[in-house]
């Protein structure tokens, strides 16, 4: 009987359409042990001068570090967005590849875990500005404009700008699994001190593979910008935001970060609060236009919500000493930190390796830094969780009992 049915079954299978698997059906999360082992840290200089780091890990495990040119007068970036790739988990790095030019780097580089496509978001100049979407279908080797891509306004009629945000994510859990989501912001007409109190963070999301990008409801607090998002294992999305200005008469600690949550896949944000411990850059550089861009990632560990956050850890007014904080309970507490870069440094971006690839078990931090100036060069640190566990305890909560130290 089986021998008679087999040809028909095979014939039918040949004509089945091929669609990318939803991210939730893909094996994107592994075991805690892959991030453990012997404590290890390596440093690589990837870029000279310029700014704006974003780092992602392609579906095949290729690490893609992106960088953008910045002109002193906020003019057009002649060299645009460039990337360097590593196919061996970060040991060696290929040459510079141009994503788009001339342009500014909008950040929010996003890997679609269903199709493997990677999206980047150039802007014609310092925003507000014309913007477009670029895509790579070969893990960052080549890039092309998505001709039919559209970014829709929010309910207030405001089309957000892309510059600058931490890398985006693909949602893996719940009814919105497969959705692409990245932070974005509205500049309130221009980046000047008078507009700071009206600016707000937001997010854009795509349910059609990166062609149509809808804008979420605004972040609950004004004066925000340069956000980062991470999805927890229960499907909630955590939003961590830089602060540029607070309402008049505010009694908030001006050195700390805003955070909020989404339970609908990034459509709305609620429960905004000041994080108890995470610094918003140098603690004494507070004032209009203060704060600092930060990195954020959830380690792809099954059933665990280990979040990493990176920013300057300076008690002075100088941006320096990029440090990584660790939460083992999905941003409830941050009991551990370790400095990665000693000296002048600023913006940083975080990501983590994928199970079953050369990147597995590694954590990646791309930062601005140098010996004499914080914007001197672009450096890539790769390390593991064991290395972070040798850091110092912060007093904000305790290390979990399930953690094998």
Where are these regions (language model features)?
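N-terminal secretory signal peptides that target proteins for export/translocation
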Residues: 1-5
